[in-house]
Amino acid sequence: SDDFQRQVLAARELAKIKAAEEEASRLKAIAKQAADAAIADAESRMAWANENQIRADYEQEYKNASVAMVSAYVAYGNEDYLLSKQKAEEVSGIFSNDFQAQVAADRAAKEQLAKDKAAADEVMPKARDRMVWADQNNIKTDYSAVYNSAHSAMEAAEKAYQIEKYAA
């Protein structure tokens, strides 16, 4: 009968709709799970950035990551999990392992430069005083080779100090 056929077609159509809804729900759950993982990584990297005061030395990178993090949260709240994941991954890309290693290297170099400068600041005045003493006592006349060597070394040290090559 026609009624039976319509019922069968309606049931089939309803089953297709239900299957499509279940598939959409499954895909949404997968996207949410991926966004959750990406956000967790991004949050970890933002925490690292905050603990290491990245905002002070890398202001633009920090700003870009902060904007992306907020965007990830907003997209997540709107259940746009793909965009949320994308924005969270942007944060992770900005504060990547390579970036973290570069920050550590930059800071180690800066710390070493400060140590080298402190050492130079301690010895340079003494060396200058000794050169003044040598000049006042006319050491160049009696010990010209030693004086010339010391004078050349002092000039090199002054030039190195001016260009922040303190360990030279």
Over which residues does each language-model region extend?
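Long, charged/polar, soluble alpha-helical segments
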Residues: 1-168
